[in-house]
Amino acid sequence: MKRLNLWAASLLLMLCAGMAHAELTIEITKGSDQAIPIAIVPMANGDDLPENVSRIVSNDLERSGRFEPLPRESLISRPSSSEEVHYQDWQQLDSDYLVVGKIDNQGGEYRIQYELLNVNGQNRMLGEVVTSSRDQLRDSAHYISDQIFEEITGIRGAFSTSIAYVTASGVGDDIDYALSVADADGHNSQQILSSDEPILSPAWSPDGGKLAYVSFETGRPGIYVQNLATGQRVRLTSFEGINGAPAWSPDGRKLAMSLSKDGQPEIYVMDIASRDLRRLTQSDAIDTEPEWAPNGRSLIFTSDRSGNPQIYRYDLGSGRAERLTFTGSYNSRGRFSPDGDAIFMVTRDDSGYHVARQDLDTDRMTILTDSDWDESPSVAPNGTMVIFATQEGTRGVLGAVSADGSASFRLPSPQGDVREPAWSPFLD
């Protein structure tokens, strides 16, 4: 399969045969050697519920790469509260932390009581009662995972966030495309748009309420914004040539994009309310894939003005662009870490295309993945993981890797091709 450079032309992406509306399932591919051992005891009264809260929490923490849940068969007892815990038993299992709890059904409303215990310190770190409806049990489990993750690591958990992605069904020239949104673990997939023309580059608004994307539904590319709550759609651009790579400003008032209406693809910024356009770059090269810095004062973008695709930074105050990447002959699709201290990108070496991280203070680049056909990285809002598209055999799947490369997992669809992932902001 020939690699298509999204930075180079009209952002056309031909997807292989697949399903347009299927939940993704997580497959852990690599665990971290520094993962923290934690025992998550099945919650009392929780086995017969439509969602296994304890198992969801265990899966969440494991795929973060920060934790290694003990296998259920190794648990020597099943306490449901801290009063029932014999800490020496769990010390023998080399577990640093212990999660216990119980679930009570109170007339169709579920009362989830959980505790996080420090095994070596023999003390309770966290305890809470969460009230949930039957339909919200999975959401409640993700919430509990977020609280445990933050209590131990000091980093806000991102298990209650969402991902957007593009799938396709059909073969040959008869392909149906779909834009879907799912929980960060691939469950609760909901299709928000279907089309017999390509859909590309989904991008979340800062408040998580809208998606911008590129659709070819009129026969040529246009940039659209869709309200996820109401389904209302607005077409913002449909110029001749390329209309691609929308990126929201941190305040949600502007979209950066790549347009070729004046010749070569250049970076523009649109004020969404007024539709006023401001052209930023002026070059004979291809400039595309803009991304706003978290502070809103600059953007990064991909350009081949040096002869090969590299990542540049455009300062909105001075109007100057500077090259950021010098390692290797191909670096594209730059994405900031939430703190703005690093960028994640696709880089090419002799073995293929990989997700990499570059520290902006030292300029040191680290390749994070060992797959050879990676593209479209998107960073979790807490900066701990990066989701991306890659190849598994002849199929496109989604992968994720920790920010330091120590842990990874895949989110393949049951069949078919999945592309263009975008991780949501925190959904408060």
UniProtKB/Swiss-Prot annotation:
InterPro entries: 6-blade_b-propeller_TolB-like (IPR011042), PD40 (IPR011659), Tol-Pal_TolB (IPR014167), TolB_N (IPR007195). The keyword Signal applies. Coiled coil: none annotated. Keywords: Cell cycle, Cell division, Periplasm, Signal. Residues 406-428 are annotated as: Disordered. Pfam families: PD40, TolB_N. SUPFAM superfamilies: TolB, N-terminal domain, Tricorn protease N-terminal domain. One of its GO terms (cellular component) is periplasmic space. It comes from the Bacteria. Part of the Tol-Pal system, which plays a role in outer membrane invagination during cell division and is important for maintaining outer membrane integrity. Belongs to the TolB family. The Tol-Pal system is composed of five core proteins: the inner membrane proteins TolA, TolQ and TolR, the periplasmic protein TolB and the outer membrane protein Pal. They form a network linking the inner and outer membranes and the peptidoglycan layer. This is Tol-Pal system protein TolB. It comes from Chromohalobacter salexigens (strain ATCC BAA-138 / DSM 3043 / CIP 106854 / NCIMB 13768 / 1H11). The gene is tolB.
